[in-house]
A protein has these predicted regions:
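Serine-esterase "nucleophile elbow" of acetyl-processing enzymes
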Residues: 1-57, 61-62
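Alpha-helical cap/lid subdomain in secreted, periplasmic
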Residues: 22-25, 44-213
């Protein structure tokens, strides 16, 4: 029996059930019941989550954070986590993960879909005063995805420098945005979750078996 840890925000919560099914009975999957949110929340959470599972021996960890970090949820309208901070916290998170196992997979942030362009004009979620600056949780599709690619590229370089495998979930979804991304512009449709689950399970199985992707 192999022990695998799955970490991530709502995207992980969406594909996790199918990943468990695809990995089969010879793999025990540990994962938080809660949304792992932004990267620093995950760094804080790892200790308590591991403790809640009885601090099991870990054969592999597959994780991703980033979508929460890219939201503009503060009154200044800036990205919640600047790139430099995102990289530093991911560096610390990688060290944390390496303390459990050297068999690690970090997954890239998936792209947003065309619905972002439709929802943005009326998506003033913080400032309700018409005279106040508009603050949105996301952005239009192109600038949102440009930020996603920028953060993915920097984090990929960081992970690869540490010998950590990278599961490129961005590329799985990119090119199929209408098919795979839902009407909220961020979360996958069922077909999107399914294709992500297959890719995650495939990469986990390859890493457990010691084969190259």
């Amino acid at each position: 029996m192999k022990n695998v840890v799955l970490i991530g925000a709502s995207i992980r919560l969406g594909y996790e059930k199918e990943v468990r099914e695809l990995l089969g009975d010879d793999v025990q999957v540990f994962s938080p019941k809660e949304n792992c949110r932004y990267t620093k929340f995950t760094l804080w959470g790892m200790f308590s989550w591991m403790e809640s599972w009885g601090s099991p021996h870990v054969d592999l960890i597959h994780w991703n954070t980033g979508i929460w970090d890219l939201h503009r949820c503060t009154a200044d309208g800036l990205l919640f986590t600047p790139l430099e901070e995102y990289l530093e916290v991911n560096r610390r998170l990688a060290i944390q993960m390496e303390s459990y196992t050297k068999n690690l997979i970090w997954a890239t942030i998936i792209p947003g879909g065309p619905a972002l362009d439709k929802k943005m004009p009326g998506n003033s979620l913080i400032n309700t005063d018409a005279s106040a600056p508009k603050v949105h949780l996301t952005d239009y599709m192109e600038p949102w995805n440009a930020d996603v690619r920028r953060y993915n590229a920097a984090a990929t370089e960081l992970m690869q420098s540490r010998g950590i495998r990278v599961n490129d979930l961005y590329s799985v979804i990119d090119g199929h945005l209408d098919e795979y991304i839902s009407e909220d512009g961020i979360h996958p449709r069922p077909a999107g979750y399914s294709v992500l689950a297959r890719k995650v399970a495939q990469e986990i199985r390859r890493a457990l078996d010691g084969t190259e992707s």
